């Protein structure tokens, strides 16, 4: 696509020819088979691109191709390469390796990557691959030294857990119970990881040809995240929270310079709030980083900053941009940076000069959250200033696209088509953008309507309101397999960004600060009314569902209205008092989401808890949660289930063994969730 300076889109000749070629190739294949709606097990046929990394000296791009392993019920990843014009797409690693984190050497001769917990190298000229590490723990944040001789990475270093009690009298060879586990750490469990081992993440380097890793950091602190070498290769810049009270400051961090030879640390930033993701400019003179002054708000936009290489002259580049900076990379000439942020639900790349006005280049970044239409994408800058990124669409998961700027214009060419074989045989639900006014204060609320295949506006359809989690996240114009599967069953699906959502400015996101749920409920009901007013919805067949924060609003809604025939609450929070004392991030939630600790202000916690309104519920309700969810623990689901049982309300609980808060990490769970939701809704249709 070509994008003019006002952001309007027109098809380029390249894209048109690409689509015509794809159509001509697919016509014969479709001749003997009918196009049909998506099926539940199509989940296993989805693929998507992520982690694009362009070579420093050619048009070759390496990226991660993600796919679903039906036999192992896992999402797997392999490395592929493609030229910037879309030609020469080929596999770099085999499906036997679960590969990720590709990083080019500075001269473009090698690619380092992580596969099955070890660092591997791929030699471009010979095509040879080799494992170069034998680590006890998995590495992350691979970073090449400027001379290509070293690779830095972060890795967890376990520490022997202490136990103050030793039980006497155990005979040799006796089969006693497992010993008690003694815990005295504030951070003792995490969603997706379970109960944490004692230890911390540290920074290491190792020779690029393989060898013994050298530990560079020390102390009882975590050192992880993005790293960047100084131009002479003698120092590494990184971020960490090394304050003594770091456990009670869950988001604070500073930028440090680490002298590799002496191990000396120099702190370059100093403020109350996170400073992170340092990147040295190509000319070696400056460091860019992201951060924010912490005001203890539930949502705070991180801005882009630059400083001299010695930490002096810190200045903000995006103070006038009321959005959260999600990523950034230096332009090759060091005169500015390319930045990535969400605006009105859409992933946006802009060029931010060191001095002067920024220029928006595209708003089509995203596609990584293929399950539900959350924002989220990735990009990287090529040596000649072109940008490769994950391209978003409502009709398919993330593909790769390349953005160029010939003669002052902006052109975007999609260069992969990973899901063509599946999607040319499936009828995908059409998505339409809508805006409507909130009945609370007339604020404009943004949303999207997904129509079932074969939609006829003269007919009446059941409506599903699908609510995003967070609550400080955003939906957008992205492919969403779960919602598509609902639409494939004949439902119109509405999804919106009510107050509290991100990408509409910090003030809009914080309209629910210390006040959640509240008028976000009204924004959602206004969206339902706006769709009903279009004339194609059966008002007696309204349904509601949502996950995490969307589960909160689902259970809140049925405690405040009886308009829905049935509800499905996915991993909800029911009782804020019990939540903050059971969730893994309790030291964050109590400081940023609530005005006081629960025993100091129990009325506030209960006022905003769906359990306080369960006596009003008449709606049949399905509850669906992972048994290993440490973010919104299954005890929340159990509270609501038992309350509804005591009230005699038709209810069911679906428990997913071994599943964390991220239910869709196993493809079969991704398939099960919409299947159970549709089963429940069909049960209560007219």
Name each model feature, range by range.
Residues 41-77:
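Beta-strand-rich domains and repeat architectures in extracellular enzymes and scaffolds
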Residues 40-44, 89-93, 128-133, 214-217, ...:
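A short beta-strand motif characteristic of beta-propeller blades
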Residues 72-78, 118-120, 162-163, 200-202, ...:
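Structural motif
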Residues 243-244, 409, 416-540, 547, ...:
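Cap/lid segment of the alpha/beta-hydrolase catalytic domain
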Residues 83-87, 123-127, 207-211, 259-263, ...:
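Short loop/turn segments that connect beta-strands within beta-propeller blades
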Residues 46-61, 96-112, 136-154, 180, ...:
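Conserved beta-propeller blade repeats
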Residues 76-77, 156-204, 239, 249-253, ...:
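Predominantly five- to eight-bladed beta-propeller fold
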Residues 495-686:
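Active-site-proximal cap/loop segments of hydrolase catalytic domains
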């Amino acid at each position: 696509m070509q994008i003019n300076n006002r952001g309007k889109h027109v098809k380029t000749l390249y894209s048109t020819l690409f689509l015509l070629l794809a159509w001509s190739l697919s016509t014969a294949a479709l001749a003997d088979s009918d196009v049909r709606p998506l099926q539940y097990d199509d989940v296993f046929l989805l693929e998507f691109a992520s982690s694009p990394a362009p070579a420093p000296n050619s048009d070759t791009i390496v990226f991660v191709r993600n796919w679903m392993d039906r036999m192992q019920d896992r999402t797997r990843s392999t490395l592929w390469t493609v030229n910037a014009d879309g030609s020469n797409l080929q596999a770099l690693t085999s499906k036997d390796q679960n590969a990720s984190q590709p990083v080019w050497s500075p001269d473009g001769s090698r690619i380092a990557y992580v596969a099955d917990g070890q660092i591997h190298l791929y030699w471009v000229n010979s095509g040879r691959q080799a494992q170069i590490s034998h680590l006890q723990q998995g590495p992350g944040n691979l970073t090449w030294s400027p001379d290509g001789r070293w690779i830095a990475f972060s890795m967890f270093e376990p520490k022997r857990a202490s136990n103050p009690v030793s039980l006497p009298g155990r005979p040799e060879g006796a089969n006693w119970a497992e010993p008690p586990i003694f815990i005295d750490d504030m951070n003792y469990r995490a969603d997706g990881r379970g109960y944490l081992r004692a230890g911390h993440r540290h920074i290491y380097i190792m020779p690029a040809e393989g060898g013994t890793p050298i530990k560079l950091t020390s102390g009882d602190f975590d050192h992880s995240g993005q790293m960047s070498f100084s131009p002479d290769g003698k120092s590494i810049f990184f971020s960490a929270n090394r304050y003594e009270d770091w456990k009670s400051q869950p988001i604070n961090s500073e930028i440090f310079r680490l002298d590799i030879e002496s191990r000396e640390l120099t702190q370059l930033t100093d403020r109350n709030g996170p400073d992170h993701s340092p990147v040295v400019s190509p000319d070696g003179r400056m460091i860019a980083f992201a951060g924010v002054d912490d005001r203890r708000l539930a949502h705070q936009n991180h801005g882009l900053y630059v400083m001299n290489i010695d930490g002096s002259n810190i200045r903000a580049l995006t103070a006038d941009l009321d959005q959260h900076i999600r990523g950034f990379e230096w332009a090759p000439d060091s005169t500015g940076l390319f930045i990535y942020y969400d605006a009105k639900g859409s992933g946006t790349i802009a060029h931010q000069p060191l001095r002067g006005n920024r220029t928006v280049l595209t708003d089509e970044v995203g596609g990584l959250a293929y399950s539900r239409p959350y924002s989220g994408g990735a990009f990287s800058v090529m040596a000649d200033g072109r940008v490769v990124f994950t391209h978003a669409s409502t009709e398919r998961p993330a593909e790769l696209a390349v953005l160029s700027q010939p003669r002052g214009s902006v052109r975007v060419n999609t260069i992969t088509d990973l899901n063509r074989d599946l999607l040319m045989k499936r009828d995908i639900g059409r998505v339409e953008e809508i805006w409507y006014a909130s009945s609370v204060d007339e604020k404009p609320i943004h949303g999207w309507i997904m129509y079932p295949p074969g939609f006829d506006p003269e007919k009446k359809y059941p409506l599903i309101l699908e609510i995003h989690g967070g609550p400080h996240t955003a939906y957008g114009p992205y492919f969403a397999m779960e919602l598509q599967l609902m639409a494939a069953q004949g439902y119109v699906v509405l999804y919106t960004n009510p107050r509290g959502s991100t990408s509409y400015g910090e003030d809009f996101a914080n309209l629910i600060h210390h006040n959640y749920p509240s008028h976000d409920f009204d924004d959602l009901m206004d969206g339902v009314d706006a769709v009903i007013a279009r004339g194609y919805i059966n008002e007696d067949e309204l349904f509601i569902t949502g996950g995490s924060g969307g589960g909160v609003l689902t259970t809140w809604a049925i405690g405040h209205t009886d308009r829905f025939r049935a509800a499905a609450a996915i991993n909800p929070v029911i009782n804020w008092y019990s939540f903050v004392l059971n969730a893994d991030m309790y030291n964050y939630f109590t400081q940023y989401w609530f005005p006081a600790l629960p025993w100091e202000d129990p009325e506030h916690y209960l006022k905003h808890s769906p359990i306080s309104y369960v006596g009003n519920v008449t709606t049949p309700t399905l509850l669906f949660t992972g048994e290993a969810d440490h973010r919104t623990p299954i005890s929340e689901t159990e509270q609501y289930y038992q309350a509804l049982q005591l009230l005699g309300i038709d209810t069911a609980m679906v428990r997913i063994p071994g599943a964390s808060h991220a239910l869709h990490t196993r493809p079969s769970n991704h398939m099960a969730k919409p299947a159970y939701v549709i089963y429940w809704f069909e049960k209560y249709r007219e």
